[in-house]
Amino acid sequence: MATYLIGDVHGCYDELIALLHKVEFTPGKDTLWLTGDLVARGPGSLDVLRYVKSLGDSVRLVLGNHDLHLLAVFAGISRNKPKDRLTPLLEAPDADELLNWLRRQPLLQIDEEKKLVMAHAGITPQWDLKTAKECARDVEAVLSSDSYPFFLDAMYGDMPNNWSPELRGLGRLRFITNAFTRMRFCFPNGQLDMYSKESPEEAPAPLKPWFAIPGPVAEEYSIAFGHWASLEGKGTPEGIYALDTGCCWGGTLTCLRWEDKHYFVQPSNRHKDLGEAAAS
């Protein structure tokens, strides 16, 4: 029995299946962890959702910002952007079934035995694990309820950007959503910066990657995350695993086998697509 952690798939279905064949993933025996952003940008978002849903208890995933945006498009709140390549999914006969399943997925995965935590963007250093679990449940409860469109309409925005237990209502839910799905840089006190997207070396002072600021969760648990493709899986402290390596941008899809910390990669088909386009 093995545990495989895979970074942001972003609709790259063919690469996902090739990578799972490479590692000899066996549903029912092995467990697959996915860092979120299953959809958008790649050509196979519909196939990705159908496949991941079919895995049942053999998969543990978290929602990413692109997954939430898809739900907002589905609810009629946000615009379907052509670059996201979501139309086949939105027009599929099983779209309702797939997206109602998707909105019931968690923001946080925890394995106490492995001392492993996974969230799409990471864990803000302002939270301990108890707070992170409570915050994840708050958003998950709204997403799985009939009032989820109201939340999705209000989730967009960069404020508030500083955690306080006193946060209430939509501001609290927006901060939680941003921390779990959009976070990259923080100020030294842990306050979120929602504007900078460059590499850590190019970020303006005093910003630091969230994982460079000591926090209580990282002291006791390993943390796996995606979201930040420009890291290229590098530059994180021991016990922090950056798994998004930009498959949808022509990079690779990365898998970490947890038991021996061995990495597997599958090159993006985007190189092939671009080459064929240039030759045609």
Swiss-Prot record:
Pfam families hit by this protein: Metallophos (PF00149)
Keywords associated with the record: Hydrolase
Signal peptide: none
InterPro entries assigned: ApaH (IPR004617), Calcineurin-like_PHP_ApaH (IPR004843), Metallo-depent_PP-like (IPR029052)
Gene3D superfamilies cross-referenced by the UniProt entry: 3.60.21.10
Family: Belongs to the Ap4A hydrolase family.
Function summary: Hydrolyzes diadenosine 5',5'''-P1,P4-tetraphosphate to yield ADP.
Descriptive protein name: Bis(5'-nucleosyl)-tetraphosphatase, symmetrical
Organism encoding this protein: Escherichia coli O17:K52:H18 (strain UMN026 / ExPEC)
